[in-house]
């Protein structure tokens, strides 16, 4: 009797797995077709290649994407601004066609961004960062204030209010989970764990082409503001900052952001009761606030 029960369970599991493999393979194929539409370019920098999207005209917004991102996520974050500004949306280290410089630290990512801007003939830019991209954005503004017009942060990683006594050695998904099928099967758990719709998976595929970046974020980027706390003296920022955060964000603690913004000079903080980590439902409000921020900054020459 038990043999039949166990056999039936194994048969059902095998059928489920086969269905998920077929669905995942289809989704990965469609994701690669989707990426081709972005018209990404690749540039040779001193250390290797960087892929990016460059579109629009006007003041430049350099988009710094989060974990499981790439030039697609970087561009999608800013696509509502495409008619008013020039959007430069590169893949960070290890994501979608971008090589890694040195250890892949935020400081090295900043150096790579400077090279990219030089190649594209851009003197100054606004940095718009989401989630894990916050560390590189802060590093850029601190290291290169002369190249920075302003910081715009969406549910971004934020500096600590005091030096942490300890921090994890790894802050992100384990490397063995970073493959297309595993993440695809786990996607129904996105909502209860991260507050993200399961459909978010379709913007993360192909995971196989983002894995190096994900592991780098978890082992280096996400730890940098804790590990090198003294190097993130954000009180010295020379440009204005605009921060957006939803109170129900499950990935970036709202209370931590509330405390962090008090360290930042000339910082405007806009919070939402809901919207989660992706600030869903607030597109028009955000677009209006960002446009006002840039317009005001241009009138004052972007000085704190």
Predicted region positions:
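Alpha/beta-hydrolase
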Residues: 171, 177-232
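Conserved acidic catalytic loop of the alpha/beta-hydrolase fold
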Residues: 108-125
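Conserved HGGG/HGGXW glycine-rich cap/lid loop of the alpha/beta-hydrolase fold
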Residues: 51-97
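Conserved hydrolase catalytic core segment
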Residues: 124-162
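Conserved alpha/beta-hydrolase "acid-adjacent" motif
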Residues: 250-256
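Flexible "cap/lid" loop of the alpha/beta hydrolase fold
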Residues: 151-180
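Short beta-strand/loop motif that positions the catalytic acidic residue
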Residues: 237, 243-245, 249
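Catalytic active-site module of serine/aspartate enzymes centered on a nucleophile-bearing elbow/loop
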Residues: 267-304
């Amino acid at each position: 009797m038990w043999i039949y029960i166990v056999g039936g369970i194994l048969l059902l599991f095998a059928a489920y797995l086969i269905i998920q493999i077929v669905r995942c393979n289809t989704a990965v194929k469609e994701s690669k077709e989707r990426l081709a539409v972005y018209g990404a370019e690749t540039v040779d920098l001193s250390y290797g290649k960087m892929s990016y999207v460059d579109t629009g005209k006007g003041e430049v917004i350099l988009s710094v994407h989060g974990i499981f991102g790439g030039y697609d996520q970087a561009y999608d974050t800013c696509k509502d601004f495409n008619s008013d500004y020039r959007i430069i949306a590169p893949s960070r280290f290890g994501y979608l066609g971008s090589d890694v410089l040195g250890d892949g630290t935020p400081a090295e990512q900043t150096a790579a961004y400077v090279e990219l801007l030089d190649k594209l003939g851009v003197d100054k830019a606004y940095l718009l960062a989401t989630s894990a991209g916050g560390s590189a954005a802060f590093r850029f503004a601190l290291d290169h204030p002369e190249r920075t017009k302003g910081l715009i942060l969406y549910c971004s990683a934020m500096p600590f209010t005091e030096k942490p006594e300890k921090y994890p050695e790894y802050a992100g998904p384990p490397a063995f989970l970073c493959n297309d099928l595993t993440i695809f099967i786990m996607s129904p758990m996105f909502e209860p764990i991260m507050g993200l719709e399961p459909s978010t998976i379709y913007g993360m595929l192909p995971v196989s082409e983002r894995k190096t970046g994900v592991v780098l974020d978890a082992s280096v980027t996400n730890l940098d503001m804790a590990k090198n706390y003294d190097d993130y003296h954000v009180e010295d920022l020379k440009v204005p900052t605009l921060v957006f955060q939803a109170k129900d964000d499950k990935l970036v603690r709202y209370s931590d952001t509330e405390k962090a913004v008090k360290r930042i000079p000339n910082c405007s903080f806009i919070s939402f009761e809901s919207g989660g980590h992706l600030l869903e439902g607030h597109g028009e409000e955000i677009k209006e606030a960002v446009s006002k921020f840039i317009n005001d900054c241009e009138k004052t020459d972007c000085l704190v």
